[in-house]
Amino acid sequence: MLKRLLRLPVRSYHSSSSEHVKSPNLGPLNYGKDSPQYAVLSHAIKVSVPVVGFNERALVHSLNQLNYPSTMLSIIGASNSPSLFHSSPAVMELIKFHLVDKRLRLVEDLDQESQEKPSLEDLLLKRLEMNVPVAQHLSQLLSHLAIPGPFTVETALPELHRLSDDLIYYSSEKDHPDFAWYSKRIGLSCAYVSSELFMAQDSSANYKETFEFAKDKLERTMQLGEYYNNTEEWAWYTLLNTINLAKSQMARG
């Protein structure tokens, strides 16, 4: 696990403009928008996942709708190692695609040269709004992200960091290259994850309570400096979910 952490590509200690230059590629995905993988995964996220969730059925449904053979599943999941707890490498790729695609779409229409930037709250709420079509399946998504292993270390956590980094960089939030740079991003990451957890259980109309929760969580995190409490909260969330998932898997035999 430590070796994997050391091999991970990391962003510099503080943001530089070169890290946020928009490009046609979809890194860290290893395929482009003109590829069969992108066609299937994009269709699955838009059409199949809102109905059946983040699972292989969603992929099979999209393969059938697009007239691709079922053997495409192995191609879609080729970049992911098999996992004991994850359902399949293809589903892991579906989750990765969801995380990366939504992060890129969040800022694709923003003008980097504009002097007027959206607030951090606006961008956070916009990202949560992107979850509305799949909100009823967020518990399933989050359970995958909480599983310890290569996928969590190499995909889920780096994507969460990239999201928090982009939220701050593209917003009007003031940023400084000091110790608070890192703690601010951890706090924002935890505020976002907490909001997703809330949304997964929210039954209010149009997820109104989720957005109110997110506003309050963000304000307490960014204005009152709940960085360290949030870090502890994230650690406990991951640990407890891991234990509960392991117990569930053992009970099933």
Segments and roles (model prediction):
Residues M1-N30, G253:
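N-terminal mitochondrial targeting presequence
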Residues R4, S204-G253:
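C-terminal peripheral helix-coil segments that are non-catalytic and often amphipathic
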Residues G27-T71, A78-S88, M92:
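Short, amphipathic alpha-helix enriched in basic
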Residues S88-L104:
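Short, basic, alpha-helical segments at the C-terminal edge of helix-turn-helix-like DNA-binding modules
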Residues E108-H137:
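Hydrophobic alpha-helical connector segments
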Residues N131-F151, P158:
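Amphipathic alpha-helical segments used for helix-helix packing
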Residues F151-S172, R185-S189:
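Amphipathic alpha-helical packing segments from all-alpha helical-bundle domains
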Residues W181-A200, A214-R220:
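Hydrophobic alpha-helical segments that form the core
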